[in-house]
């Protein structure tokens, strides 16, 4: 719950936006319920969801992006936490960047991402066009991943950031690191225009 409350306090899940999940095992995950304020979530606000089917046995409504969480758990067996946020930086950068990835390079904080050991690497963060058809969106993401493996997270154009990690701490570090890098990139672009 602490990570959810931290996200809420940062304003990264405004107006009940965003969602979070934890893997229980190979079959199940726990996903935040739709329409809940992420800054005040309790354990009762998480629904058990079957990873293969996206179904919640309770009958309650899981997040609209359930299919993206379960996709990540299927693509990355080592992923045990998924965080989806609607930050200003992620939302705006994903709209102004016209290519299919936001390329980050030269930032020391790239090393906050698992496996990154230098600021000299190019770190591409894939950008997918937003789609209300989550099944179709998940299929596009899966196809992209087969050709260009995803790492850490991806952006949905005009929507936000989805990231993951081997546990809550790693997912949170990826979220915080990427958000910092996005803020740096926003500032860099603004200053270059001035």
Curated annotation (Swiss-Prot):
One of its GO terms (biological process) is pentose catabolic process. Keywords: Amino-acid biosynthesis, Lyase, Metal-binding, Methionine biosynthesis, Zinc. Its EC number is 4.2.1.109. Zn(2+) binds at residues 84, 86. Binds 1 zinc ion per subunit. One of its GO terms (cellular component) is cytosol. SMART domains: Aldolase_II (SM01007). GO terms for molecular function: aldehyde-lyase activity; methylthioribulose 1-phosphate dehydratase activity; zinc ion binding. It catalyses: 5-(methylsulfanyl)-D-ribulose 1-phosphate = 5-methylsulfanyl-2,3-dioxopentyl phosphate + H2O. Pathway: Amino-acid biosynthesis; L-methionine biosynthesis via salvage pathway; L-methionine from S-methyl-5-thio-alpha-D-ribose 1-phosphate: step 2/6. The keyword Lyase applies. Its cofactor is Zn(2+). It is an enzyme of class 4 (lyase). PANTHER family: 3-OXO-TETRONATE 4-PHOSPHATE DECARBOXYLASE-RELATED (PTHR22789:SF0), FUCULOSE PHOSPHATE ALDOLASE (PTHR22789). NCBIfam families: PRK09220.1 (NF006672), salvage_mtnB (TIGR03328). Catalyzes the dehydration of methylthioribulose-1-phosphate (MTRu-1-P) into 2,3-diketo-5-methylthiopentyl-1-phosphate (DK-MTP-1-P). Belongs to the aldolase class II family. MtnB subfamily. This is Methylthioribulose-1-phosphate dehydratase. The gene is mtnB.
